[in-house]
């Protein structure tokens, strides 16, 4: 692994950047000082001196940005390419400790068409997904990806001017597991904080006897009988335990085509580390272990290996 090379590149980049900043600050200060002295000698007005100084400062800063881009573009490209290579090696290293039949693609994820086709959630106006992982844990097949969804919003001020901006409505992980019961109809169980509530008329809003669960979750079912077949009292307790353990902004359990989908809206990207810092391999591996632990915990806590009800 090229961690030593990566850290050396980061150190060199930081030194060059600091040196350029200091030199630039000195040059800008000298130029501005000379300009002010010349304007004072010409007996220019205070307004002209201030305006000229501001314009010169903006121009000089723009020149500095251009110089930085020109000088450091190759360095940043080399660092980023090495970052991607090391990240893939670290992720695969940790995955292989726990799973079999592993595939990992950091640039691809669950496609927008898949999310739409399966009716998992609204994909908003801007959709992206990466860090696709699939594998087997205790004979249970799974896959997961990071997903980011943004929706276009408009804001009107008092004068009627409209400003368009994009708001992140989902940023987190989407996981898919083989489920240990067979069913024909879809079922959605989600915490009240989960966004993207887009359902057709075929869903009905139902409640169960567990008041605490009803207060924390919304349940939408296509078939009430199948919903209660899946949501046994013991399974409900497992869902409550998972929800408390994850503590995200929202969580969705979606039962679809004999699969269990779990969306976790926690404003986080799994398996990432700061590309602007030197790599601490042990620390990064520990963080990745935590990200991977979630997959194992969900399979274990929800008892997905129990195939008693499989037909």
List each language-model region with its residue ranges.
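Transmembrane-cytosolic junction motif
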Residues: 20, 62-90
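Juxtamembrane membrane-interface segments of multi-pass membrane proteins
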Residues: 1-7, 80-98
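Canonical alpha-helical transmembrane segments of integral membrane proteins
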Residues: 21-41, 56-60
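Membrane-helix interface and helix-disruption motif detector
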Residues: 40-51
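Hydrophobic alpha-helical transmembrane segments of integral membrane proteins
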Residues: 50-67
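Charged, low-complexity intrinsically disordered regions
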Residues: 92, 96-101, 105-155, 161-311
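Cytosolic juxtamembrane N-terminal segments of multi-pass membrane proteins
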Residues: 1-20
